[in-house]
Amino acid sequence: MKRLMVFGCLAGALACAACERIAHSEVSQKEEETVVRQGDVVFSLDEVARLFAALPVGEAQVAEVRDAVSASAGNGYDEEYTLQNLFEAPGSGIGSAPATRVEGYPEPLRDLLAAEVRRQYATRAVDPEAFLDALSESDVQLYWPFSEDFTTDEAPIVTFNPGDNASRNIGYIRREDGTIEEIVVDEEMARERPVWVVNRNIDAEYQTLEMRRREDPDWGQGGSILIRSGEGQDTRASGKDFKTLVLRSFKSKRNFDSWLAGGSEVWVKCGAIEDFTASTEAELRLYTPSITDFLIVVRRKDVGKELTFNAVLVSEWTGMLDNCAFMMVEDDGGTQTSWKCSAMVKYNSRSYGFEIEIPLRSRDDIIWRGALTRSYIEKYNGITGHFGDVDLVLELI
């Protein structure tokens, strides 16, 4: 949402479905996933997992993590508990307002963690307080897959995301005598007993549809519109008939990442010329494309399920709009690049393409991209359509 930037210009070309990638020098994806650089402090996810595994986690701490991941899931995110929240507001989830954050944990995880860091790092080169500050300011989090399936307060196995799309990893479990046992952990085990995964958060800075609708009831049912076409004009002033393109439902047919990385963060992006009613060449040049985008988080338990959204993609689709540019990506980070494409309109029996750059990042998995024509949408109006590994129900109403 905040990260989007739009550049619109008039181009007499057909809609483009090609992607232009920009080459960047980057650290390896494995290093980016597993090594954290926070100021002068550098640490690994494995190091953090070992710290959590050493803690005498009991009923109160399990309840704290359960409260946090449940709150995150209720706000449309994955089952996540960021270390920022762990230190600043124990038991709070991503998107939780300060007034709704849970208080009063008798012995929060942050206290146990701080005591363990001070004990282990007392004789190390890294200052314990600097390390704690780095942890609290980082994007590291605890991810508890399938948390809703567990009602007991059994102490968890703690593991971490080793990168490289690994399907299993070493986990650590604390025995009653305080010793740490290593165990191989896979997704099947995470379904059978509590497993906390130390990984990195990539979606906390963005708002899900649930958060948008809750915080701003007047905002509507769609995504974040960055630049509205015909900016400065009174939209709908022409009195022309228009329809609204709505995403009724969404179904992901597979997971796009390893379970150790969490669920799928899917960005839905749509570029179009809203309320296009130009009658002269001069009016034609007043229009600029709009890009609507929003985040859909698909938890692993929801793969294969049809999720209802009723989200607006194009609010004012007039008879002069031929198509829109549409893309879905699964967010995997990397450097900023874009997809150059066009949204087509008809004017005086001629087709014009408005050039659009829809942002994405270099490691994103492109699920589907291309032009959605009005004829296609009307033919399959309200009927499930197949877009790569995702099924959508689109409707012009």
Where are these regions (language model features)?
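Sec-dependent signal peptide recognition
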Residues: K2-C9
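C-terminal motif of bacterial Sec signal peptides marking the signal peptidase cleavage site
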Residues: A15-A18
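Acidic/polar, low-complexity intrinsically disordered N-terminal segments immediately downstream
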Residues: E20-K240
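Short amphipathic, basic-aromatic surface patches that mediate peripheral association
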Residues: R236-A261
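Eukaryotic beta-sheet cores, primarily in C2 and C2-like/PH beta-sandwich modules
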Residues: V268, D302-R350
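Solvent-exposed strand-loop boundary residues in beta-sheet-rich modules
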Residues: A272-F276, D332
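Peripheral membrane lipid-binding modules
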Residues: D275-D322
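C2-type phospholipid-binding modules
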Residues: D332-I397
